[in-house]
Amino acid sequence: MNTAPTTDNNAVRKHDVRPELFVDGYEVVIGIEIHCQLNTESKIFSSAPTDFGHEPNTQASIVDLGLPGVLPVLNAGVVDRALKFGIGVNAELGLFNTFDRKNYFYPDLPKGYQITQMANPIVGEGYIDVVVNEGEKNEYPKRMGITRAHLEEDAGKSVHDAVDGMTGVDLNRAGTPLIEIVSEPDMRSAHEALAYIKAIHQLVTWLGISDAIMAEGSFRCDCNVSIRKPGAELGTRTELKNLNSFRFIERAINREIERQIDILEDGGKVVQATMLYDPERDETRVMRTKEDANDYRYFPDPDLLPVRIEQLTVDSIRAAMPELPVARRARFEEALGLSEYDARILTGSRQIADYFEDVVAEIDQQDAKMAANWVMGDLLGALNKDDKDIIDSPISAKQLAGMLARIKDDTLSGKLAKKVFGALYERAGGDADDAADKIIEEKGLKQETDTGAIKAIVEEVIAKNTAMVEEYRGGKEKAFNGLVGQVMKASRGSANPQQVNQILKELLD
């Protein structure tokens, strides 16, 4: 490792003991291994495609099948993506890295070994800063250490439900490039573990190096869990394997913590084991114990030369890196005046952040808070309801900005803007950037701002609602709101609310 991280990471090893995170008097210690598939078009050592969802054994080459006489050739795109990740987590980079063979037998591993990086990984020590949410109004920042991240090839997949009574092997996934990310044992609760996993997931998608679709197996997590009394030596750890949803990760860790506490409280000992989580029964159970563990007998792969990376290559990749989530979040707070919460939501994905900035670019920067409210509330709410991503938004950034401009110049009230937004979402204005203006014109949604016209409506409402007027003059403030509502109803929501309030007060007081 000979490329230093850009920021000091001495804080990685330091832990603030948080007694509020103890469970029944035990401190929880968690370390995490993440297997993330890299989104290259071809596999790490062959030209076979990496597409997901094809018929079994149609995406495997002779290299992936481990046929005699074939040699692996390293995919340069895999190296570039790994370097991006290393830069993104402030890590030391292995400008000299090598590949090793991890030897074990399993039906979905045709060569009888997996090519990985044991001795000299491409990414060394680094860290990632996260925000941990331990419940309502209980958030805190924490720096999580990363031990290393190394390249390796994925294995195939055993298929248990294709033929009754038999297990098949699908080698489409064999040879798909992986980066395995190994954390320090820095997490002290399931919430902290989940915050770390989500931060890594956000980073790899933000950098564009992985689609990280957990349901497709392109982002898989193994969690090492142990417990101890405060100040004691580390306890015996167990490993929760192949957790593939955020919801199950948190539940599985909590169930395993409870299981280990029950064992120790009953006077027993936790046995080092690989665990499975059963979501239907909401429990963890032993898959195999330490005695069953493999001796992988690592040794250097003789078919692959060491990888030597020029510093110029690293500098070029670093220069082309997008602004990272933490930096963008800070800029949204400092330059645009957004709250920490708003900035965090708007940097939840690179696509959301880009969309928001595209909206702000079309309006006055001072109105960034208004844009944030519409993007976070109305737009993301509608998209989530329809199970869509921001890239599938039926409203373009320029169209939303056009609607916000009409709010700003008083063409639209907030209530009318909701109607225009709904029409935009249903694509009533088509693809044109000025779709909001077309909808306002066609549907007659322009706000009434003529003082004389509004005053006439107010006078008519006062004349028809004498009882409510007397209640207001008698000191019942709620009656005033009732009169405002009657004016808005009479104007079909088009009257400017501020002018309605002003004129109504002038006529009643």
UniProtKB/Swiss-Prot annotation:
It catalyses: L-glutamyl-tRNA(Gln) + L-glutamine + ATP + H2O = L-glutaminyl-tRNA(Gln) + L-glutamate + ADP + phosphate + H(+); L-aspartyl-tRNA(Asn) + L-glutamine + ATP + H2O = L-asparaginyl-tRNA(Asn) + L-glutamate + ADP + phosphate + 2 H(+). It is an enzyme of class 6 (ligase). Keywords: ATP-binding, Ligase, Nucleotide-binding, Protein biosynthesis. Its EC number is 6.3.5.-. One of its GO terms (molecular function) is asparaginyl-tRNA synthase (glutamine-hydrolyzing) activity. PROSITE patterns: GATB (PS01234). GO terms for biological process: glutaminyl-tRNAGln biosynthesis via transamidation; translation. Pfam families: GatB_N (PF02934), GatB_Yqey (PF02637). It comes from the Bacteria. InterPro entries: Asn/Gln-tRNA_amidoTrfase_suB/E, Asn/Gln-tRNA_Trfase_suB/E_cat, Asn/Gln_amidotransferase, Asn/Gln_tRNA_amidoTrase-B-like, GatB, GatB_C_1, GatB_Yqey_C_2, Gln-tRNA_amidoTrfase_suB_CS. Allows the formation of correctly charged Asn-tRNA(Asn) or Gln-tRNA(Gln) through the transamidation of misacylated Asp-tRNA(Asn) or Glu-tRNA(Gln) in organisms which lack either or both of asparaginyl-tRNA or glutaminyl-tRNA synthetases. The reaction takes place in the presence of glutamine and ATP through an activated phospho-Asp-tRNA(Asn) or phospho-Glu-tRNA(Gln). Belongs to the GatB/GatE family. GatB subfamily. Heterotrimer of A, B and C subunits. HAMAP family: GatB. NCBIfam families: gatB, PRK05477.1-2, PRK05477.1-4, PRK05477.1-5. This is Aspartyl/glutamyl-tRNA(Asn/Gln) amidotransferase subunit B. The lineage of its organism: Bacteria, Pseudomonadati, Pseudomonadota, Gammaproteobacteria, Moraxellales.
